[in-house]
Amino acid sequence: MSILLQGERFKKRLMPILLSMALAGCSNLLGSNFTQTLQKDANASSEFYINKLGQTQELEDQQTYKLLAARVLIRENKVEQSAALLRELGELNDAQKLDRALIEARISAAKNANEVAQNQLRALDLNKLSPSQKSRYYETLAIVAENRKDMIEAVKARIEMDKNLTDVQRHQDNIDKTWALLRSANTGVINNASDEGNAALGGWLTLIKAYNDYIRQPVQLSQALQSWKNAYPNHAAATLFPKELLTLLNFQQTNVSQIGLLLPLSGDGQILGTTIQSGFNDAKGNSTIPVQVFDTSMNSVQDIIAQAKQAGIKTLVGPLLKQNLDVILADPAQIQGMDVLALNATPNSRAIPQLCYYGLSPEDEAESAANKMWNDGVRNPLVAMPQNDLGQRVGNAFNVRWQQLAGTDANIRYYNLPADVTYFVQENNSNTTALYAVASPTELAEMKGYLTNIVPNLAIYASSRASASATNTNTDFIAQMNGVQFSDIPFFKDTNSPQYQKLAKSTGGEYQLMRLYAMGADAWLLINQFNELRQVPGYRLSGLTGILSADTNCNVERDMTWYQYQDGAIVPVAN
């Protein structure tokens, strides 16, 4: 009996020791309470987590902070820094290993290593993931599908992701990204897609089909969107509607009663103003909408706006000159209640309600060139820009668009002399298959002469600056440029049209004046579709200066027409 009692006493003394050992083992597997934050959303910046890393003495907590920082660095588009931080990790417990695996898959997806990312995800047990971690799992799946241009699979992954989100802002971001995927998908893919019994997918497909069906009829589109919300009251996108579509729910068709046209019609800018006015008036034709013209060379912009308001004018086209536009931008309250289509943009341009910016910007051409080269299969372009302010602006515009397309910087070089391009090409000869140059006709002819001897198969793309001779019969120049492609306004596409012939005669074939005329004509087109342009995402107009659309700040963008010098002729080519 005494032996049994001693045994019971021994068990009681041993139990706390065994329990503490068991808990220590669990801690090694699952980590401390702080490590459990890996199962939640990381809402701070990478800088915050890195600072915390330097303040903690606990090794386990240091690893957790590194994982949190690595996760956020990807969100901040600092993928290489995230990968480097993972390489610094020491010994991890099971909870940390699980989170590292999620981050590694996300890094692989960011690097377009899609098969690797998919295999890394397959190795994970979904049952061991928290809702927050599951949302990250499905986000990586969505990115892999998007990388593969499989937009429907990407949407399906984001639907699963949405089920695991708890934060309202993350819900909204996911809704907006899902909508962006559908908007970017080919209409044929959308029309042939099946909802596979997935009610959420069915709702999304119905929404994008309604959008595609009525994009050219904004009033009907607005009604269709409201009908969709009524038909799918429990859909995630009905609760948090895609931000891009919100303004369409209360869309009002453009209704212009009278227009104020603000142009320099005397002094130094007279020829610019009168040429734009001519294009505007010709496009107006027999329209009964009254147009009152204001000379910005004779009166201040503030006085003109006051006069327009007194006359009951609520729609303005202009001003043209940058200094006059800056007057409006310095005090936007003066145009409150008015629709304004400015005919320029300045460094101070920003998003202001009911104000859009339209001009013949060389930056538009650079973006069009990036699109064209990418569509032509160019992956490592050499971009030659003049060493001046124009070159810096256009080079930056090209690079921004190239980053969006390729995920990397373009090789932008700046020249002082046309001969400089030979050095640029020689430095990158093994990789460069195409050149985009902003240059005058004389400069481009000199560049091409050098390059023909060094890299005869180099594809050359140029801006409209190099096509200034295209409107005359300079056959020597055209022959020398054989094979060169250049962008310009579509107005020059049909040189036999009565409108072109009339304008060529009245301007003496002056290239820049013809472009300003086309700009004036498109200003009439744009102001009469002002609400559609501002409020309907993806709304496009076919104008004389390009295919016109507006970005989120209502900068009017122009998709250019591309031409090529071929055997002594200038012919349009596919964009």
Curated annotation (Swiss-Prot):
UniProt GO MF annotations: enzyme regulator activity
Pfam families in the record: LppC (PF04348)
Disulfide bond residue pairs: 356-554
Lipidation (N-palmitoyl cysteine): 26
Quaternary structure note: Interacts with PBP1a.
Keyword Nucleus attributed: no
Native organism taxonomy: Bacteria, Pseudomonadati, Pseudomonadota, Gammaproteobacteria, Pasteurellales
A GO-annotated cellular component: periplasmic side of cell outer membrane
Organism listed in the record: Haemophilus influenzae (strain ATCC 51907 / DSM 11121 / KW20 / Rd)
Family per record: Belongs to the LpoA family.
Keyword ATP-binding: no
Gene symbol of the encoding locus: lpoA
Covalent lipid adducts (S-diacylglycerol cysteine), residues: 26
Places the protein is found: Cell outer membrane
Chief localization: membrane
Gene Ontology biological-process entries: peptidoglycan biosynthetic process; regulation of cell shape
InterPro entries for the chain: LpoA, Peripla_BP_I, TPR-like_helical_dom_sf
Cited function: Regulator of peptidoglycan synthesis that is essential for the function of penicillin-binding protein 1A (PBP1a).
Highest taxon in the source lineage: Bacteria
Protein's membrane topology: Lipid-anchor
Residues of the signal peptide: 1-25
Protein name: Penicillin-binding protein activator LpoA
Keywords: Cell outer membrane, Cell shape, Disulfide bond, Lipoprotein, Membrane, Palmitate, Peptidoglycan synthesis, Signal
